[in-house]
Regions:
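Conserved N-terminal entry element of GNAT/NAT acetyltransferase domains
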Residues: 1-14, 150
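Active-site rim helix/loop that mediates acceptor-substrate recognition in acyltransferases
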Residues: 27-54, 60
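Short hydrophobic/aromatic beta-strand or adjacent loop that forms the aromatic wall/cage
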Residues: 48, 141-146
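Conserved acetyl-CoA-binding loop-helix of GNAT-fold acetyltransferases
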Residues: 82-85, 91-104, 116
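Conserved active-site alpha-helix within GNAT-family acetyltransferase domains
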Residues: 108, 112, 118-142
Length: 150
């Protein structure tokens, strides 16, 4: 297995700008939205964290936790969001490691269950997530899958 570094953002607050830019490039959500969430986390205003995988100093994977990942089921919170691994680094266990890290960290902070919206149909089950229901994404014509991690 490769020697990657897995961190939560409080360990490396210096990466906030680079991480916000990276997530913005992957998902198209304004960089400022990521900066706002990350800054609140770094200042201790929320325990909803941000998690990264680094190859040296290069961000190659990441995800965060927010109240609601742009869907109509506001009662299902918090949500793991922005799950992404760079294409050249896929199938190496990075996303799975990050998911397990997030679950462990959030459970230790008293957050259980966690939720996640995705169009994937088998990936998350490998890491203990279960399909819960279909939800309507904000401004989306199609319903999307909601998973739960108890």
């Amino acid at each position: 297995m490769e020697n990657y570094t897995y961190i939560e953002m409080r360990e490396r607050p210096d990466l906030m700008q680079a991480a916000a830019r990276w997530f913005h490039e992957k998902w198209g959500i304004p960089k400022e939205a990521y900066l706002s969430c990350m800054d609140a986390y770094l200042r201790g205003e929320t325990e909803y964290g941000w998690y990264l995988c680094l190859d040296g100093e290069k961000i190659i994977g990441g995800m965060g936790v927010i109240e609601n990942d742009f869907h109509d089921r506001k009662d299902l919170a918090p949500n793991v969001c922005a799950v992404y691994t760079e294409e050249d680094y896929r199938c190496k266990g990075i996303a799975g490691h990050l998911l397990n890290m997030v679950v462990k960290d959030m459970n230790a902070k008293g957050f259980c269950p966690l939720y996640l919206v995705t169009d994937h149909t088998s990936f998350y089950e490998r890491y203990g997530w279960e399909f819960l229901c279909m939800v309507q994404g904000d401004g989306e014509p199609q319903m999307t899958r909601m998973y739960i991690r108890r």
